[in-house]
Design a protein with these regions (language model features):
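Subtilisin-like serine protease catalytic core
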Residues: 1-108, 126-135, 164-167, 189-194, ...
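Generic beta-strand/beta-sheet core signal
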Residues: 6, 96-98, 138-141, 171-174, ...
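Glycine-rich, acidic and aromatic/proline-enriched surface loops and short helix-turn segments
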Residues: 78, 115-118, 138, 229-233
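Amphipathic, non-transmembrane alpha-helical secondary structure
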Residues: 107-117
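Short acidic, glycine-rich surface-loop motifs adjacent to enzyme active sites
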Residues: 116-151, 173-174
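Active-site-adjacent substrate-recognition loops and nearby beta-strands
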Residues: 144-153, 173-192, 198-224, 235-237
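Catalytic-core regions built around general acid/base machinery
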Residues: 152-170
Length: 237
């Protein structure tokens, strides 16, 4: 199973992630980022006064400019020998950076979704749908401050539906805007085609910050999230 991650980037050579990175060839101790990594960050985000990003723009290798992506990937597949911190330690991963230090746009989010449909080489050429991941994790939301609003919700919805039609499961965080009703309000958690996940405490109660349904923002009254899972005090990379 291959897990695709879309986030702030990933520290691919982290001890808990390196052996599971699809681009790493353990027998030769070499790596190939073609078809395994894409950077959708081409310009600095306007939320930041400074323009210095530790990963730069259009990074040719997996890089995490904030740390959030590395943590989420460890939660999914992290494993270092007997030190298995992920829930699917036998899976491998590929990735796309869709946020610049925690901020994205509809364009960066959609670009990563489209890349996962048919991953390309580092020149963004020769797309190959046979290298698409089986599931994509998205621990982010696109609020109005990033440019998502009811007028353009359908753009990302089309891409999510295309991924589902290709047999790819789109997993999305329900959001951290709880605890009121209707607080699942950002793409891609709001869509029928996404599998959105809320957060629980160790005692199986819902965490206060975890967003609740139903989805009111688009008038659908859709029941979300689909499931809940541990979301606090999670040991990861």
């Amino acid at each position: 199973t291959t897990v695709g991650g879309a986030d702030t980037g990933y520290e691919w050579d982290h001890p808990a992630l390196k052996q599971k990175y699809r681009g790493y060839k353990a027998t030769l101790d070499t790596f190939d980022h073609n078809y395994n990594w894409h950077d959708a960050i081409h310009v600095p985000d306007t939320h930041h006064i400074d323009v210095g990003n530790p990963c730069g723009m259009d990074s040719q290798e997996p890089c995490d400019d904030q740390g959030h992506g590395t943590h989420t990937m460890g939660t999914m597949i992290g494993s270092e020998g007997d030190n298995q911190i992920g829930v699917a330690p036998d899976a491998q991963w590929c990735a796309c950076r869709n946020m610049e230090r925690g901020y994205g746009t509809p364009f960066t989010y959609i670009e990563c979704f489209e890349w996962f449909l048919a991953p390309t080489d580092l020149n963004n050429e020769n797309p190959d749908p046979l290298r698409a991941p089986h599931v994509i994790n998205n621990s982010w939301g696109c609020p109005p401050t990033e440019g998502c609003n009811p007028d353009n919700f359908e753009l990302m919805n089309i891409v999510v539906n295309n991924l589902r039609a290709a047999g790819i499961v789109v997993v999305v965080s329900a959001g951290n805007d709880g605890s009121g009703c209707g607080s699942v309000y950002t793409p891609a958690a709001i869509y029928d085609g996404s599998f959105s996940v809320g957060a629980t405490r160790p005692n199986d109660t819902i965490v206060g910050f975890s967003s609740r349904g139903p989805v009111w923002v688009d008038g659908s009254n859709r029941l979300k999230p689909n499931v809940c899972a541990p979301g606090t005090g999670v040991r990861s990379s």
